[in-house]
Amino acid sequence: SRKIKLVAVYTKINSQNISYIEKNFNLGKINQYHGIKKGIENTNYLIKTKNKKYILTIFERRVQVKDLPFFMNLMSGLSKLSIKCPRPIKNKKGIYLFKIKNKIACLVTFLNGKEKNELSNKECYVVGKNIAKLHKASKKLKLYRKNSLSVRSWDKILNKIDNRINRLSKNLKTSMKKELFQIKKNWPNNLPKGIIH
C-alpha cells in the first residue's frame, strides 16, 4: 500500500484573521486555533471557543468557487434533516462564504470522531447504512449540481494524459480513446439521479 503525504496547511492564518472571524461571526472569543495536517486538498484549522469547536476551511486551487454555495446548502440541508455532517455557519450578514488571505473560506461545526485506517465488516455495514440515509434524505432537498466527474468530463481528463503513458503499454492512449468512445456510445441516459458521496 502507498502512503500519501498529508500536508494540508497550505495557507497560514494569523491573529488578524482570527479577529476578523470573531468580529464577523457570533462564535464568541476564539481561545485557540491550530492547523490540521490530515487531509490533502484544502487548508483546515480547528478553532476553539470556551464551549465549542469549529472547523475553518480555506479552499485551495482545485475547488470551483461556483460550486461552493451548492455544498454549503447541501450540508445545511442535510444537517436540518438529522444527517450527521458538518453544518456551515453563517456570518452576521447571513452569508456562509468569506475571504481569508484572498481565498474563499467557510466555518463549519465540529464533528467528534476519529480516523479509522481499517474497517470491520460491521463498520462497513454502518457506513453503507448511513450513506443510504444520506441518499434518502437528500431527495427531500431541491438541490442540483452537474457531476463534474461523470462520463462527460472523461474526454478532458484523457486529453491531459501525456503520450508517455504509451510506455506502460504500446498505443495505450489510443486504445483508451477507443474504449471511451464505446462507453459514451453505450452510456445510459435514463439513470436515476441524486446526491452521492
Tell me what each language-model feature is:
Residues 23-31, 176-186:
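Short Pro/Gly-enriched beta-strand edge/turn motifs at strand-loop
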